[in-house]
Amino acid sequence: VSSQLINIQPLSQPVDLNVAPATFSPDVEAEIDRHLAKYPVKRSAILPLMFIVQRERGGYLDPAGVLYLANRLTLRITDIWEVATFYSMINTEPVGKYHIQVCKTLSCKIRGAGTITEHCSSKLGIKPGETTADLRFTLSEVECLGS
């Protein structure tokens, strides 16, 4: 069965398609071109390009960035969104200047990750998944970053 025909996962959140694709400076476009040249199949460049677009779009992959990637890689928007929502290092919402990510897996919880999350939450006055009012800190629980 062709991978183009399989798309049974619903989007975890809607993407506003009433935007124009992002545009970038010639330097950023050249950086993207260099990455694309490394891969014989354009789709294989999806993660490096997501990191570039995220960096250039204010620290997260916004709808305009998603549309840009879909156009540039000749992929469906759902293909881009599935990858973006799978990896915890791709932000699909704005995050604070300092993004604190604490592992939520059992092995890290046993070693004290829960205590770290509770301490950060207490000091910052936010719960995991939230950003401080001054947009300085975001606290997130993620899959293990060390494995």
What do these predicted ranges mean?
Residues 2-147:
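Signature of N-terminal electron-transfer/Fe-S-associated modules in redox systems
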